[in-house]
Amino acid sequence: MSKINEIIEAVKGLTVLELAELVKAFEEEFGVSAAAPVAMAAMPVAAAAAAPAEEQTEFDVILKAAGDKKVNVIKVVREITGLGLKEAKDLVDGAPKPVKEKVSKEEAESIKKKLEESGATVEVK
C-alpha cells in the first residue's frame, strides 16, 4: 500500500471530532485555513443572493394623475407637504410628480391612501 492509501485508510477510521482536530492541526502546522478557499468561492454567490433580499426602506410617493376632484387633491397635497396653495396646485397640475420622497413604508402607504381617497391616482416606488 502506498503512503497516500495508508493516510486515507487512517482518515476513514477517524470520528468527526478527530477529523475536526486533524483539520485544525493542518491549519496550524502549515499556516493555512481550510475555510478561506471555500468562503471565497461562495462569497460572490452569497453577495448576489443577498442583494435582492434587501428590503427597501425609503419610498417615494408619486402623484400620477389628479382625477376628477382636483380641488380635493390639492387640499390633501397641501396637508401632506405643507406647500402653499400655488405650489400645491402646480404640483398637481404637473403630475406625474413626486409628492413626498424618501419616506417610510408606513408613511408612504398613509399618504397614498389619503390621496386616493381624494380621487388621485398614486404610485409608491
Curated annotation (Swiss-Prot):
InterPro entries: Ribosomal_bL12, Ribosomal_bL12_C, Ribosomal_bL12_C/ClpS-like, Ribosomal_bL12_oligo, Ribosomal_bL12_oligo_N_sf. One of its GO terms (cellular component) is cytosolic large ribosomal subunit. It comes from the Bacteria. GO terms for molecular function: mRNA binding; structural constituent of ribosome. Pfam families: Ribosomal_L12, Ribosomal_L12_N. Disulfide bonds: none annotated. CDD domains: Ribosomal_L7_L12. GO terms for biological process: translation. Forms part of the ribosomal stalk which helps the ribosome interact with GTP-bound translation factors. Is thus essential for accurate translation. Homodimer. Part of the ribosomal stalk of the 50S ribosomal subunit. Forms a multimeric L10(L12)X complex, where L10 forms an elongated spine to which 2 to 4 L12 dimers bind in a sequential fashion. Binds GTP-bound translation factors. Belongs to the bacterial ribosomal protein bL12 family. This is Large ribosomal subunit protein bL12. It comes from Heliobacterium modesticaldum (strain ATCC 51547 / Ice1). The gene is rplL.
